[in-house]
Amino acid sequence: MAVKVAVLGGGNGGHAAAADLSNRGFCVHMYEDARFAGNIKKVFDTHEITMAGAAGNATVKIDMVTSDLQEAIQDVEFIFVAVPAFAHDVYARALAELVHPGQTVMVMPGTFDSLIFWKEFRKKGLEDVVVAETNTLPYATRLQGPGSTLIMSLFNPLKVGVMPACRTQETVEKLRAFYPSLEAVESVIACGLSSLNPIIHVPGCILNAGRIEYAKGEFYFYTEGFTPCVARTTEAIDKERIALLDSFGYASDIVAHGVGGSIITDDIGEAIASDPNFAKIKGPADTNSRYYAEDIPYGLAPWAKLARAMNVDVPVIGSMITIGSALLGYDCWTRGHSLQDLGIEGMTKEELKEYLETGK
């Protein structure tokens, strides 16, 4: 009998995960909020997704497509959350009412937000529920339309942190049935600080803002926009990220080693240029893109807030958030999740590491 899993979200990540997992023989319950279900009416009507690219070419049947969250997670052991970061609070509160002992929730990606799920679950007194997060979506993917997804590549390794960290080994062993390239890191904080999107999206978006607004999507983000000065800014952000990881005593590696290029190099510009998948990526079309609206307030800003609490200086990251706020017309420092939202405000480094390890 096929293993049942739930995939929450009907966007890029949700389409790719539902199609890939179904194609590999898992029984997939795909959920989309009723407010947005009309965007993927074709999938609701046909229960089919056409996939192409690195994970195979097929039109696959999705066992369940629903806007009933309780129905979606009924009798499943693993729940994969692939929704924008600004929706994580809503999903955390909703799942806290419905999850049951023995279930594992994996946020793809998390960028610390697994802590929001854990906080909400603890409020409900939930026992024997595990929350994991990945450092990126498992796939470099683009929707080609409702019910159609292009998977350009699969991330290998795909880093994962588990809350509580004391359950990492058993949890990752189970999750590798779905994502064999998973590589465990020390905690969900270590995983969140390994997130790729804030590093490789934000500097290019800010330094190419005029070109992005003018081109309206007819712009190859990496081929045209990832010039040497953008690469240097990216590496400056990366150094500050590594300094924060180092302050916790966590293992670290430069972003150039994690983007999946065909050569091994310490130069992020060379790494990006060596991967033909980056050359295909156009956009963003405007400053409403998730590259801005998600990766600055929900990506870089939580890093900077944690750095401030841990007395780690991150001036380049801070400048990106401040300039991003001016570009976007709203305060990216306050729009994203706070340490209070994550349930870790006021903790010393030692207290935080204990909480990450034990969940208490």
Language-model regions, residue ranges each:
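Small-residue-rich helix-loop
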Residues: V230, A236-P276, K280
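Substrate/ligand-engaging "lid" and interaction regions
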Residues: P138-I237
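NAD(P)+-binding Rossmann beta1-loop-alpha1 motif at the extreme N-terminus of oxidoreductases
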Residues: M1-G53
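Long, low-complexity C-terminal extensions of enzymes
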Residues: G258, I263, A271-L352
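Rossmann-like NAD(P)-binding element
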Residues: N57-V99, Q103-M106
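Nucleotide donor/acceptor-binding cores
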Residues: A2-V3, V129, N156-L158
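Rossmann-like NAD(P)(H) cofactor-binding subdomain of soluble oxidoreductases
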Residues: A85-G147
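A non-catalytic, amphipathic alpha-helix used as a structural packing/dimerization or gating element
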Residues: V90, E170, K174, C229-S247, ...
